[in-house]
Design a protein with these regions (language model features):
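Hinge/lid segment of periplasmic solute-binding proteins
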Residues: 48-103, 157-160, 241-245, 310-317, ...
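Short, solvent-exposed loop/beta-turn-alpha elements that line the ligand-binding surface or hinge
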Residues: 63-79, 121-122, 144-155, 168-189, ...
Length: 383
């Protein structure tokens, strides 16, 4: 990032950008930004997880770019739809998209070859996915077909449920965010498939911490790994012979889920806001984004980046990542952005885990989670 900041400062002599990490991890930023907001010392721009967007917007200290993003120069519609939705909680555009990812199915090519099982097809279905996971499970060799997190992070447990829900025509919440809809027939069918895989086929590694599936995959004990582009450096460093395909389809849809993050602009006066907009408009332009991608291994936040000459160099630097970038076209919907979202996710994630662990039936667990979510959603004041 510092190199990009230096380039911007050199080409924009009337604006000086100072970069700061803000914390040891991105997760550390929210409490620091929240503290700064309370003290009246908010930064001009901060990198904020998309799941925090609604809470940050509630502060009253963010800008609203809604009236300017479609003017010439911003190329707003060149951002992927999920990113556009996440940066606009409640319809208020609080900044610019910063990062996008998605879930796909990563598989161990050597394990498939050894088992004599054809590798997954990009056009596969959930029934085929179940059959492949069952075939690849080998208790004698301690090999599981696929993973699903049941502990450690309820968001991780929940967001793997959303693609199958959307693919079957379901929704997470009502349009007004007052009622949970994830317990629809689409949701029950989706969770029932995973329940059968976990409790009947015994083909699913139920990860109790959401951190054990990765080493299980790199050590050759997990045939298929439902994860995302953040795994690419780890897999290549571990010299795993891997490839990836989109998530299986229901009704012909391979829709996936994405967790976009944002560059949020805080209102520190019109001059500083204008400077922040100029910087982020420049930073998120295709060529600068490609430079960032080369150093970070992140996916393109704009489809137009895939057409740049330097894109092929990015593909060479991060072997295997190309299909994950192509899979962004399947990230069509975003998770809701509202202050109560973390608590809704807790209710849903705990319900899903109870089913996969054999402690509850899909419909009953989803109905209970929906009742809890409805109560949370209708509490005045939100989160």
């Amino acid at each position: 990032m510092q190199g990009l900041v230096n380039s911007f400062n050199a080409s924009h002599p009337h604006i000086v950008v100072q970069a700061s990490s803000g914390g040891t991890s991105t997760g550390d930023l929210l409490p620091k930004v929240t503290t700064a907001l309370a003290a009246g010392t908010a930064p001009d721009v901060a990198y904020i997880y998309g799941s925090y967007a609604a809470n940050i917007a509630q502060s009253g200290k963010t800008v609203n770019l809604k009236n300017i993003i479609h003017t010439p120069g911003y190329n707003w519609n060149d951002f992927y739809p999920a990113s556009q939705q996440i940066v606009a909680p409640g319809g208020k555009v609080i900044g610019f998209p910063a990062l996008i990812d998605n879930l796909s199915v990563i598989y161990n090519k050597k394990l498939f070859a050894a088992a004599g099982v054809p590798v997954p097809s990009p056009n596969w279905t959930w029934d085929q996915f179940r059959a492949v996971a069952k075939k690849m499970t080998n208790p004698a060799k301690h090999i599981y077909g696929v993973n699903y997190p049941t502990g450690g992070d309820t968001l991780d447990t929940s967001w793997r449920f959303f693609p199958g829900l959307w693919q079957r025509g379901g929704q997470i919440l009502s349009p007004d965010h007052k009622k949970a809809l994830f317990n629809s027939p689409a949701g029950v069918a989706n969770l029932t498939l995973w329940q059968q895989m976990a409790t009947v086929d015994h083909s699913v590694y139920l990860d109790p911490t959401a951190e054990k599936a990765e080493p299980l995959f790199t050590s050759g004990h997990l045939a298929m790994f439902v994860s995302g582009p953040w795994e690419v450096p780890v897999l290549n460093q571990a010299k795993v012979d891997w490839a990836d395909v989109p998530l299986p389809a229901a009704d012909g849809s391979h829709q996936t889920v994405s967790g976009p993050d944002n560059w949020v602009i805080f209102n520190n006066g019109s001059a500083r806001v204008a400077a922040a907009i100029t910087f982020l408009e420049w930073l998120t332009a295709p060529q600068q984004e490609l430079t960032w991608m080369m150093g970070s291994g992140s996916l393109p936040i704009r489809p137009s980046i895939l057409k740049l000459p330097g894109y092929k160099e990015w593909l060479k630097k991060y072997p295997g990542i190309g299909p994950m970038a192509q899979n962004l076209v399947n990230a069509k919907e975003a998770m809701p952005t509202l202050p109560q979202w973390p608590r809704v996710v807790d209710a849903l994630g705990n319900g899903i885990a109870s089913v996969l662990l054999g402690r509850a039936a899909p419909a009953a667990a989803l109905n209970q989670a929906a009742q809890q979510a409805d109560t949370i959603l209708n509490v005045p004041g939100g989160g």
